[in-house]
Amino acid sequence: AININNIDIKKILFSIGSAAILKKKITTKQQLSNLKAHLYKQILFSLRMNPSQQNTRMQIREQFDFATILYQKGLHKQSLTMLVKAKSQALDFDEKTIAYDILELEKIIESQFITRSISGRADQLIEQSEELSLQNLQASKLSNLSLKLYSILLENGYAKDEDEIKKIQNYFEEETKNIDLKRLKFKEKLWFYKANVWLSMLTQNLHSALEFSEKWVELFYEKKDRILSHPVWFIKGNTYLLKILYLKKDSVQFKYWYDKLEAAYTILPQTDNVEAL
């Protein structure tokens, strides 16, 4: 595999054109696309193996992949042990989509191969599966709502009159009427707060925008490990909060939140996405 550390992948992929490659007679024109695809795959593989490029989601997914290999090799108990550990980590970091996939493989193994241990475990797996399914449904609804409102804001700007404001508010209320706010976990809360920020901006409610941008940012300070796993969301939340405080000319609160952000930069991962912000 290609050894890549902190090399800019964009430079590797785009600095050498097809004409230059063909001129050097490295390959034929017919084989060029295959060569590029192979190079691209090797670069991605090397980046994945680089510890500095890994995040929690990738590590959990890797454990899930290993457990799948063990299952396919007939090592069912070993696979279950790894799945339980990966699922626990996924739930700790609110990676519920991966946790649900892990749980589905757990159910397959338990029901097909470990029949003597299924007593009592079946109810536990079913209950956990139903709970995760509900949480994923809520997360999907809230992320869809957030995306839709953000799209409206980018495409149309602020609501032009009272009729538009009422229409947007009615849409928001309809989409959130069945959401149980008390049961929301980190990601669902984040989507809910983001959706409220976009709603507040669309309706030009600066007070509400400040309230929910603060909730957005506070969510990360309550769970500081999420700053490391979701740095872009953390920085964007701070960006909106500071912009709103600037518009409100609240210099005291602006300095308070700015100083907290400065202190948090020491734990932010140094990735291209973070540096681009």
Kindly label every feature range from the protein language model.
Residues 86-115, 225-229:
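Short, charge-rich amphipathic alpha-helical segments embedded
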Residues 108-145:
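Flexible loop and strand-edge segments within Gram-negative outer membrane beta-barrel domains
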